[in-house]
Amino acid sequence: MPELPEVETTLRGIAPHIEGKTVEAVILRQLKLRWQINPDLGEILSGRQVLSCGRRAKYLIVRFQTGILLIHLGMSGSLRIFTPSDGRIGRPDRHDHVDIVFSDGTVMRYRDPRKFGAILWYEGIEERHPLLEKLGPEPLSEAFCTDYLYAGLKAQKRAVKLALMDNTVVVGVGNIYANESLFRAGISPHRPANRLKKKECAVLVETVKAVLQRAIETGGSTLRDFVDSDGKSGYFQQEYTVYGRHNQPCLRCGGLVVKETLGQRGTFYCTNCQK
């Protein structure tokens, strides 16, 4: 599933190509995603100019003067950009569900083999969208700090990994990056969240920020379907220290990395290095 680094990579890829441009047409090949696409989306968007693009958690936001297009990549989604300078727009296949065509010939194509993503039109106040209004702080923002995390975990008895992946605590830290952050911070994913000391919260905050920033720099992780707006794979998976390394030697102590299920997600950790 695309997590925050993959969504941020996508944002940085599409924004320069569509900001300030006017939608000419929308081609809908498949309406049934996680939530059905409005069949009138083409009529709604045609003639509207993109003011800006942004991201909140794992949601991409395309802003117009009187509304936003909210895009979620789901389990396997990606956005590709085709420009007139490419010479030829790639021929769509059965997984290419939506094309947004701009007046200068640029095309933004949504691809989603598993169809768990979403493309939603909304004309209300952005921050009050039901999918956005209860989200926690961005992990790379100043709001996600030691004091915030320490206070937020005090009343939580559940495993710290589950708390870290809760979007009401902090957004965008999915399974891959939760595993990587906890390993690098030396904290067991099973530790009750309210047992973390303040200095451990400080280390964890710093580690989460560093892991996510590095993942963005390397274009995110491509394990199956994810590609950026140019169709290129990310390569942060080459830097994994624990995720996907069960029964392999720990890179710190040489012991075997363990894989268990926690909250229905694969959890990788070293019993020696993480306490």
UniProtKB/Swiss-Prot annotation:
Free-text comment on the cofactor: Binds 1 zinc ion per subunit.
Pfam families registered for this protein in UniProt: Fapy_DNA_glyco, H2TH, zf-FPG_IleRS
PANTHER family registered for this protein in UniProt: FORMAMIDOPYRIMIDINE-DNA GLYCOSYLASE
Its job: Involved in base excision repair of DNA damaged by oxidation or by mutagenic agents. Acts as a DNA glycosylase that recognizes and removes damaged bases. Has a preference for oxidized purines, such as 7,8-dihydro-8-oxoguanine (8-oxoG). Has AP (apurinic/apyrimidinic) lyase activity and introduces nicks in the DNA strand. Cleaves the DNA backbone by beta-delta elimination to generate a single-strand break at the site of the removed base with both 3'- and 5'-phosphates.
Catalytic reaction(s) noted: Hydrolysis of DNA containing ring-opened 7-methylguanine residues, releasing 2,6-diamino-4-hydroxy-5-(N-methyl)formamidopyrimidine; 2'-deoxyribonucleotide-(2'-deoxyribose 5'-phosphate)-2'-deoxyribonucleotide-DNA = a 3'-end 2'-deoxyribonucleotide-(2,3-dehydro-2,3-deoxyribose 5'-phosphate)-DNA + a 5'-end 5'-phospho-2'-deoxyribonucleoside-DNA + H(+)
Organism: Neisseria gonorrhoeae (strain ATCC 700825 / FA 1090)
Sites where the protein binds DNA: H95, R114
InterPro entries, sorted: DNA_glyclase/AP_lyase_DNA-bd, DNA_glyclase_Znf_dom_DNA_BS, Formamido-pyr_DNA_Glyclase, FPG_cat, MutM-like_N-ter, Ribosomal_uS13-like_H2TH, Znf_DNA_glyclase/AP_lyase, Znf_FPG/IleRS
Top-level taxon of the source organism: Bacteria
Active site residues according to the UniProt entry: P2, E3, K58, R265
Zinc finger (FPG-type) residue numbers: 241-275
Cofactor(s) annotated in UniProt: Zn(2+)
Molecular function, one GO term: damaged DNA binding
Protein name, per record: Formamidopyrimidine-DNA glycosylase
Enzyme Commission number, as recorded: 3.2.2.23, 4.2.99.18
Similarity remark: Belongs to the FPG family.
Keyword Lyase: yes
